[in-house]
């Protein structure tokens, strides 16, 4: 018969409502906004086609393979309540479409060409179900939550951090001094800002040396293990690894990477290096809002969070719910669980479209950072629980008496909240009272309470269901 050339409707091949999904399929939930006049089945099928085996016309070489084995399938379409022009398209991809252990390849397929597709006005990837068979091809986080606690010898409470500000312009020696003061005051970690790489005012090697000195001095004086997230992000993978090697030679516990601007390939390489060499890896999500902030186009952060757990990182920034950056409580807790837990049930009220089984892949500590201060400590302890890192940048360095007292204030506030919670107090209701009580015997905390008593960042969250 020969083959039938010409353009045919996607839905004839790629819309398969009777398809039973396999345990090995990668499942995706897309929020689709088609152009006027394009029916949902056709738009959903187009998404499945363009992100798997399809192209705009029938090709002779289709006959040389088995499309039934390799094609993505749009297997379910559901309306979005309150949105006439939108719907959720569920697509199943056969596992063989993806290279093992490559987040890069997974994203190139699933969120590649299809996002520029003309028949769609907008497209957003809301969630991905990563099957155990694919999860098992990834190393994942270099160490994970439990191993990190064992390395640091810190249990039963959230960890405390602080981003060193001003983020750009300090010399290496002054930077190291600020690190020392924060760690000495009682923080567990300090952090390079994500923009700090190796600039003319402070080259990376100088910063690494002075920060290592600060860590060792603070450790000796406090008897606690301390760390500073040394940002190894660089212009090339080779340079990034060179910085991680130098950090390891200094004997420090943790390095840092900007995983979206640095890219998944670089991030996965660094995660492998970190596991091989006993370094913890802190991940910053600079650029995430470019991808995840629009409600109807791009990718939800829960997908970027899953991808990070596969690629590898021990900490990742994940919003505060209470500070200056975007984040709805239930939705934030949804992807926080996806980062930390081994098995997460489907729960649409928290934005989780699929049940996810991580089959013992190590967990990632969520980092709450951005516009938070001592008055937030009860809410943060309540929302995030013990397995988290709370980062007070301005909330430490903005203290009227200096960095070390700022650190003391945060540590006292945190310890007071943890103690109150352990004794059965209700942090949500009694939070302010707990902080006030503690400030009676901690002048540092009292001063911090005074500075930030009125600060609130009150806007409606955009990331709603």
Swiss-Prot record:
It is found in: Plastid, Chloroplast. The keyword Plastid applies. Keywords: Calvin cycle, Carbon dioxide fixation, Chloroplast, Disulfide bond, Lyase, Magnesium, Metal-binding, Methylation, Monooxygenase, Oxidoreductase, Photorespiration, Photosynthesis, Plastid. Substrate binds at residues 113, 163, 167, 285, 317, 369. Its cofactor is Mg(2+). It is an enzyme of class 4 (lyase). The disulfide bond which can form in the large chain dimeric partners within the hexadecamer appears to be associated with oxidative stress and protein turnover. It catalyses: 2 (2R)-3-phosphoglycerate + 2 H(+) = D-ribulose 1,5-bisphosphate + CO2 + H2O; D-ribulose 1,5-bisphosphate + O2 = 2-phosphoglycolate + (2R)-3-phosphoglycerate + 2 H(+). Mg(2+) binds at residues 191, 193-194. The keyword Oxidoreductase applies. The modification N6,N6,N6-trimethyllysine is found at residue 4. Binds 1 Mg(2+) ion per subunit. GO terms for cellular component: chloroplast. The active site is at 165 (proton acceptor), 284 (proton acceptor). Its EC number is 4.1.1.39. The record marks 324 as: Transition state stabilizer. The basic functional RuBisCO is composed of a large chain homodimer in a 'head-to-tail' conformation. In form I RuBisCO this homodimer is arranged in a barrel-like tetramer with the small subunits forming a tetrameric 'cap' on each end of the 'barrel'. Heterohexadecamer of 8 large chains and 8 small chains; disulfide-linked. The disulfide link is formed within the large subunit homodimers. Belongs to the RuBisCO large chain family. Type I subfamily. This is Ribulose bisphosphate carboxylase large chain. The lineage of its organism: Eukaryota, Viridiplantae, Streptophyta, Embryophyta, Tracheophyta. The gene is rbcL.
């Amino acid at each position: 018969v020969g083959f039938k050339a010409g353009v045919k409707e996607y839905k004839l091949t790629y819309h398969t409502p009777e398809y039973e999904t396999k345990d090995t399929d990668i499942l995706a939930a897309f929020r689709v906004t088609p152009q006027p006049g394009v029916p949902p089945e056709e738009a959903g099928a187009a998404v499945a086609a363009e992100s798997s085996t399809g192209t705009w016309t029938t090709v002779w070489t289709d006959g040389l393979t088995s499309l039934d084995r390799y094609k993505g399938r749009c297997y379910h379409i559901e309306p979005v309540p309150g949105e006439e022009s939108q719907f959720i398209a569920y697509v199943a991809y056969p596992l063989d479409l993806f290279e093992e252990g490559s987040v890069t390849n997974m994203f190139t397929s699933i969120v590649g060409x299809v996002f520029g597709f003309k028949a769609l006005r907008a497209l957003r990837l809301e969630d991905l179900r990563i099957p155990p068979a694919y999860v098992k091809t990834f190393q994942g986080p270099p160490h994970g939550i439990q191993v990190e606690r064992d390395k640091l010898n810190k249990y039963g409470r959230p960890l405390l951090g602080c981003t060193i500000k001003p983020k750009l312009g300090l010399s290496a020696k002054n930077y190291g001094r600020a690190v020392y003061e924060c760690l000495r005051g009682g923080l567990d970690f300090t952090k390079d800002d994500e923009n700090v790489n190796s600039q003319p005012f402070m080259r990376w090697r100088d910063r690494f040396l002075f920060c290592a000195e600060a860590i060792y001095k603070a450790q000796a004086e406090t008897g606690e293990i301390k760390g500073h997230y040394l940002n190894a992000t660089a212009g090339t993978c080779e340079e990034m690894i060179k910085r991680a090697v130098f950090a390891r030679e200094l004997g420090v516990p943790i390095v840092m990477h900007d995983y979206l601007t640095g890219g998944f390939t670089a991030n996965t390489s660094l995660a492998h290096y970190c596991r091989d060499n006993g370094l913890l890896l802190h991940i910053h999500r600079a650029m995430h809002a470019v991808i995840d902030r629009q409600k109807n186009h791009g990718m939800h952060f829960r997908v970027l969070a899953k991808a990070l757990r596969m690629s590898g990182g021990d900490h990742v920034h994940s919003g505060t719910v209470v500070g200056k950056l975007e984040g709805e409580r239930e939705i934030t807790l949804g992807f926080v669980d996806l980062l930390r837990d081994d098995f997460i049930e489907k729960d649409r009220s928290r934005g989780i479209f699929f049940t996810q089984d991580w089959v013992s892949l190590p967990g990632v500590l969520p980092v709450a950072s951005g516009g938070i201060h001592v008055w937030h400590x009860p809410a943060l302890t309540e929302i995030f629980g013990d397995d988290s890192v709370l980062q007070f940048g301005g909330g430490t360095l903005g203290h009227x008496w200096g960095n070390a007292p700022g650190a003391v204030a945060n540590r006292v506030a945190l310890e007071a909240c943890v103690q109150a919670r352990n004794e059965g107090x209700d942090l949500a209701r009694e939070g302010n009272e707990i902080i006030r009580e503690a400030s009676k015997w901690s002048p540092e905390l009292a001063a911090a309470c005074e500075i930030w008593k009125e600060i609130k960042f009150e806007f409606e969250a955009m990331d709603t269901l």
